[in-house]
Amino acid sequence: MDVRLIMKSARNAVIEIADGGIYNTKETYHILLNGEETFSTDTVINSLFDLKPQTKYEVLVKTADGVERGNVSFVTAYEFVTLNVRDFGAAGDGKQDDTKFIQAAILACPKESRVLVPKGTYRITSLFLKSNLRFELAKGAELVADTDRASYPKFPGVIESYDETSEYNLGTWEGNPLPMFAGIITGLDVENVLIYGKGTINGNASKENWWKNPKVMVGAFRPRLFFLSHSQNVTLCGVTFKNSPSWTLHPYFSDNLKFYGVTINNPSDSPNTDG
């Protein structure tokens, strides 16, 4: 059996327990991090969180009866600074609209640095990613989307170029260039982005709002919970996505995307949330 390092950053890592299983391992294992038992697992892909930058870690995998089955060592990446969204004005009380405060932290974040969303409930509309961003949703942190359509930016389907020889496509709906509301989390032409943690992104959709008359365009078509357009080298790790207004994860003309331990929770009868 092999224990492999799949990815690492300054604050998290992903390991693979290759015992012949596909999604689930053939037995339950205990994970020790620098000698301390961290958790038990029966899945092949496992995420490690709450790590420290530029720190050496050894991961040891044992069976339930204490037999060592494999290990892997690594040193976490460098981190320059952490920008806590609370320091930018976010309240995390579920009442204040925290969009502009979190967006300010994202725009202010330098390379090799982290935007941290600590425990709390953050009411938002659309957040826009930028390149070279590490964005952590801590355990107990939840981004909850507003359901007021008037609060969301709109993406036109097609914008004609000045010389009328080409066009710029922004909005999309079911394969056609049509107006759409910006995604709850949106990345346009971004690269080298990491979104990770034990937190939740909640689209807050229900049959009282986004899922009511879902095929009818009201202002624009429904937003995606996570929308990437013409982007590359984007990694999602550990985050839970729930109650999406439409498609949950929608990569559009994007490359080299990685998803590790992501959870998607939508009602089985919710419209178009299977993406």
State each model region's role:
Residues 1-275:
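Extracellular/periplasmic carbohydrate-active domains that bind, remodel
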